[in-house]
Amino acid sequence: TETNKSVILNEAKTLLKETAKQYKNTLIQGLQHNDLKKALKYCNKEVEKLISKDNEKDYTIKRVSLRPRNKNNYPTLYEKEILEKFNKLSLEDNKYLALEHTEIIKDENNNNKFVYAKAIRIKEVCLNCHGSNINNDLKKEIQKLYPDDKAINYKLNDIRGAFVMYRNIKD
């Protein structure tokens, strides 16, 4: 029903907002000490634990990107379509708009899943590690941790990727 969809959407928004907040707060802690390497190491070790966990409410949260730093963040074909839509919308003079996508899909077992995706935009602080003018020491550290890094040369407000939440829906 529409009411159920609305409840699920509100839960999804709250859950993703909390996940994004935890992610951002921890990175900011590393940055407050002017320690980009510390923030980078957190990204490498701890963020995956935060992002890719299933919880008791049948949710799965992923962080995906068309230009990932971490090889685990490549999108599925379905997620790639969402990211491409976000990029297209962003280019159409929506540089400050919060871009979201919601849909109910069938999974590989023909079960209904609610999908909520929210674009991740590049902020000023993100350019330290994802821009075109990265400090050489930091660049070496990034290459050590992520030899196949593609998450560079972003500009302010570019779409970095998205948080995508999947939730099982009982019929």
Language-model segment annotations:
Residues E2-K123, D137-D171:
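Extracytoplasmic c-type cytochrome modules immediately beyond a signal peptide or single-pass transmembrane anchor
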Residues K123-N133:
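The canonical Cys-X-X-Cys-His
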